[in-house]
Amino acid sequence: WMAQVATERLNQMQDPELSINQALVDYKRLGYSDNWINQRLKSIEIRKDLTDEWKRHGLQEGVQFATLTDIIYQTWSDMTAKEYKQFKGLKKENLRDNMTNKELVLNMLAELSTKEISESKNPETFREHMDVAEAGGEIARNARMELEAKTGKAVISPLNAKTGIALNSSPEEEDTKE
């Protein structure tokens, strides 16, 4: 069994597409909808682009990335990552794996905007990176507020993977759960 897992991992290192295919299988096995899976894979790509931008500026994974991520979350959702996880009833689970489609889209907008602003402004100090993270989050916050105003529905949802978010449902069905 261990040898098989090691072989699969080595094969995935040689051909990263195998890892992506495995992620698709895993999400499907967990009951996620195709639409949600596509959104989640795109969110992984956008997050990687953002962290690559941070690395390009010499920022460190860990505390600096977590601080900037918290600023992004706090700005667009009015909650830090920890508060957001508590709101959704999560302990160690991945927050993004427990976001609704709308939450994922807004988080992607916040992270994409942060990366774009960083590329444009070329921040030099950590304080400047914090300001950029806030500016990126603000773009998604404005979109969230406008959507909530026009629909009369909250975008931020306590739904998570255990409570049925995106599990074999259409976007319309997901809307009725919120």
Predicted regions and their residues:
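Positively charged, phosphate-engaging catalytic surfaces used for nucleic-acid and nucleotide handling
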Residues: 1-178
